[in-house]
Amino acid sequence: MTSWKWLIVVAVLGYGGLLALMYVFQRALMYFPDTARVAPAATGLPQAEEVILTASDGEKLIAWYVPPRADKPIVLYFQGNGGGSNLRVDRFNRLTAEGNGLLALSYRGYGGSTGKPSEEGLIRDAQAAYDFARARYPAKRIVLFGESLGT
């Protein structure tokens, strides 16, 4: 076999191997959870309380909850794939400063929530957060806010 044909074979096999590795490790490449459970007051969000939601498959989800004042909306905050709620406290303080409510969800596998992240699981988690808010507020007062993975 000539050297250029050998080079093509090696390149194709290398590329195929890379694709196989990406397939096998896709979850590790997609989700970067911070698994530490941190109290909201310890991060500079003393107005928030920690609530535990239950997803439809039984996973326990940690969320930080600040009720809205008067007729203000509640923001359901769906974070990105890296870190946890503790890294977003400045944004949460800005959202709640004018009386808006907040429900900041830690997906499964993040921030003390049980389970491992997956696309199907995150959809269940988002539904649990919406159900929590909907049980307390009319739909017109619920605002969905997604960052990166949460969009």
Question: What are these model-predicted stretches?
Answer:
Residues 7-54:
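An N-terminal hydrophobic leader/cap segment in hydrolases
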Residues 56-136, 140:
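Membrane-embedded segments
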Residues 2, 22, 100-102:
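Short hydrophobic/aromatic-rich motifs at helix boundaries and adjacent loops
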Residues 146-150:
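Gly/Ala-rich beta-loop-alpha elbow adjacent to hydrolase catalytic centers
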Residues 1-7:
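Feature marks short, highly hydrophobic, charge-poor N-terminal signal-anchor/signal peptide-like helices
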